[in-house]
Amino acid sequence: MMKHLIELKELSQIDIPEGASKLETALLVGRFAHSAFPHNGDNQPSSSDPITILKEAQAGASFRCVEYSHLAAWLMMAHGLEARTLNIMTKDVATEEYGAGHVVVEFYEGEEHGWVMADIQAGVVARYETKLQSALELSQSIDVASIEGFDGKRFTEPEGMFGGDYKEWLRPYLYFLDRSPKLNYEYFIDPEPHLILVPDGDSPPKYFQRTHKLDLVTVASDIFYCV
């Protein structure tokens, strides 16, 4: 695995200043991954590992939110951060045919911010008061949270993206939160059931968009967000 991480760092050539904090490092990686390729919700790489994603992106390919997040999470890992991809899904994910899921990244910043959600496709993080938000925190604070770019500036939705209102676009996706117990190099190879956070009174979905059977274990938030 270390060999892959070294190759990924060398291929990406992200300029991380000496002494950069975990947060600064994560945001620089996020900016790189966000700008690595144009978004195309219907295009997939020939293989789901991050080196293939980056090589094909450098050759001009465009990919989905999945590839933005998988690339960014592994680049964060390559630069010494704890990171993972997070599948966020709407309440009706089991019955919708399309557009019921989105993929983001969470990285562990430390004592000040804890786990931080970064939407690599959008190029943003969320903040409530002074604290950057995890996906779970944002599901509760989204009405009042601010959305900012990886450069710390206020986020302005690109024309034609996110329906012109990113928070309202994102809101329904924060219903189910699902992650693998560990970050896998090949995105689609998960030998273990995923962990999922389910709102009180509901149950985990059995399918993703009608066709893909889900293998999920419901856990408490302290387990989901353990370090």
Residues covered by each model-derived region:
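Secondary-structure boundary elements
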Residues: 1-63
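Hydrophobic/aromatic-rich core segments of domains that either
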Residues: 70-146
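Enriched - but not universal
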Residues: 40-41, 77, 118, 172
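Detector for Asparagine
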Residues: 40-43, 87, 184
